[in-house]
Amino acid sequence: MKIAIDAMGGDHAPKEIVLGAMKAVQHFSDVHITLFGDEGKIRPYLTSDERITVIHTNEVIEATDEPVRAVRRKKQSSMVLMAEEVKEGRADACISAGNTGALMAAGLFVVGRIAGIDRPALAPTLPTIGGEGFLFLDVGANVDARPEHLLQYALMGAVYAEKVRGIPRPRIGLLNVGTEDQKGNDVAKKAFQLLRETDLNFIGNVEARDLLHGVADVVVTDGFTGNVALKTIEGTAISVFSMLKEALTSSFLSKLAAAILKPKLIDLKKTMDYSEYGGAALFGLNAPVVKAHGSSDANAIFHAVRQAREMVANDIITTIKEAIEQNHS
């Protein structure tokens, strides 16, 4: 199995990308990785090149670049070359922690969209209090969505939850402003009807306040709403941990309490760290494309490789194509 990685994408590239790639090949004996980027910057961190190939390029798509223009003009960038590797069949999947918009553009223009999919969706797996996690899509690939798009998101999400996460008959929820059947705007109401008519295990509308309680295994929404919800969850988690840290270091007694609570706090932080689930998969393309978080460290890259490997091993793309074809028939 071959996985292509953009070694120059992300806040900590190429060091953490390279370290994560080495950890992955040590852990997975069937994985071969191709790193794309500045070889002079990659090699100092590559202490072992067993099953790792480096393809040199100086060109990089920066975080500040306009996504579509960058993909079209920077043909020799590490990200575009990575996507080309998948398109030409020399790699089975690809991963980047770089510019999200550019990766989505490279996915569409280079890797290509599955026939029958109107719009791809960006789908991270987020943590829940019970530790099960839930798949959330779309979180920003498309700010607007029609009812049929939300149905396609649900079909793709159900395949991933079942095949990769091992959840039989995953519960599908539609993010809404209330749980009643007739809640929401026109798009939500029509999407509700479409989802109810499928063979999916559709549990109805779910509210944002219940997401981290594991109310559903897959939650679908438009990219604008999904991105706002995702950033709210991220920001709240960061703020809560900051407040806890301040409260537990404000006095001698609180520091004693912190020492006692430290193992539990570490466990809690690990539970809420969604890098453990891998990156955000870009569903609807002809091959697995994984967007790792921009601040990914080596461990996050390792989990992104694990995720991509599982998507390839479980032939997710073929199953998604079959689900879409069946829905159209």
Swiss-Prot record:
An annotated Gene Ontology molecular function: phosphate:acyl-[acyl carrier protein] acyltransferase activity
Pfam families linked: FA_synthesis (PF02504)
A biological-process GO annotation: phospholipid biosynthetic process
Entry-linked InterPro entries: FA_synthesis, Phospholipid_synth_PlsX-like
E.C. no: 2.3.1.274
UniProt keyword terms in alphabetical order: Cytoplasm, Lipid biosynthesis, Lipid metabolism, Phospholipid biosynthesis, Phospholipid metabolism, Transferase
Keyword Magnesium: no
Metabolic or biological pathway: Lipid metabolism; phospholipid metabolism
Compartments where found: Cytoplasm
First-level EC class: transferase
Catalytic reaction(s) noted: a fatty acyl-[ACP] + phosphate = an acyl phosphate + holo-[ACP]
Function (record text): Catalyzes the reversible formation of acyl-phosphate (acyl-PO(4)) from acyl-[acyl-carrier-protein] (acyl-ACP). This enzyme utilizes acyl-ACP as fatty acyl donor, but not acyl-CoA.
Subunit (UniProt): Homodimer. Probably interacts with PlsY.
Protein name according to UniProt: Phosphate acyltransferase
Lineage: Bacteria, Bacillati, Bacillota, Bacilli, Bacillales
Gene behind this protein: plsX
